[in-house]
Amino acid sequence: MSLADRWITLFNKPIPNVILRLVVLFGGFLSMAMSIALMRTTGLGNSPISCIPATLSYLVPLTLGTITFIMNTCFLIVQAILLRRDFNPVQLLQIPFTFVFALMIDQLLPFCETLPMQYYPEQLGWNILGCFLLAMGVFLQVKASFITLPGEGIVLAIAKAAKKPFPKCKIAFDSSMVVVSVAISFIGLGYLQGV
């Protein structure tokens, strides 16, 4: 068996223990929160799902984590509306998990603001690390196979309600998040910020 085959086998194995799955899930949340905090601090761009909270955080007296929590709660409400009777009440667990995730973002932002980011190469390096951490966080969240955050849950609900493939819905959803963020930025600030 080649090394690549061993890695594929390892990553495709389900995690059997609930406690271990929760640890992996929270590791994913921590990685994603660090990613959001890093990308916000560099000022070079955010992930599509974080664009709206990042832009709004320059306009309203709320933290990035608080805005993220509010937006994700709205996403959960939309999931319930789209799925109607197919909405599983266990999905309400997304609320406390999102609260913890939002809290992580707010706790990591002050740390990220202390990192050296005076020059473009430093900013670029931190932003690339942020992209890697985001990918790692999403991987760990999926690997935990426990619960998704509302940002992914809403896309799953849209795909199911529209009877469209998830990848197409994800691209359309992410694109719409960026477009809305750009509009908010130009209308509210007069220039591009947080996208």
Range-by-range predicted roles:
Residues 1-195:
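Core subunits and conserved enzymes of cellular information-processing
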